[in-house]
Swiss-Prot record:
Its main location: membrane. Residues 29-39, 94-104 are cytoplasmic. The gene is ychQ. This is Protein YchQ. It is a multi-pass membrane protein. InterPro entries: SirB.
């Protein structure tokens, strides 16, 4: 297995874990389950997300693809999508109760729609806006 395929595997597993954890945490929060505020929910997701970020940066370096360049407009769009996904996930989980329950319920499926767009950009490498 090459280092690129190893990095790609780590990246894909991190994506699956990150989305699974977001979904689980949202469901626990929505059900008002005591585990929603457990210590592991504050430790594990940031570790997984950091691994996801680092593997993504390593993949960009290994493939010699840079965002904000003419050849990789899809990657630029993907990065903006990731930022939108993070904001929507933050609203959906909102532990500080800054947003209403309705806003959280709307933000979660929107985050999943943005995730779908990110996956389409990554697999097709065809920019949506370009």
């Amino acid at each position: 297995m090459t280092s690129f395929s190893t990095l790609l595997s780590v990246h894909l597993i991190s994506i699956a874990l990150s989305v699974g954890l977001l979904t689980l945490r949202f469901w626990l929060r929505y059900q008002k389950h005591p585990q929603a505020f457990a210590r592991w929910t504050r430790i594990v997701p940031p570790v997984v997300d950091t691994l996801l970020l680092l593997s993504g940066i390593a993949l960009m370096a290994k493939a010699h693809i840079l965002p904000f360049s003419g050849q990789a407009q899809w990657l630029t769009e993907k990065l903006f999508g990731v930022i939108i996904y993070i904001v929507l996930g933050f609203i959906a989980l909102d532990y500080r109760r800054m947003h209403s329950q309705q806003a959280r319920i709307i933000a979660f499926p929107l985050a999943l729609v943005v995730l779908y767009i990110i996956i389409k950009l990554a697999t097709t490498k065809v920019p949506l806006l370009g």
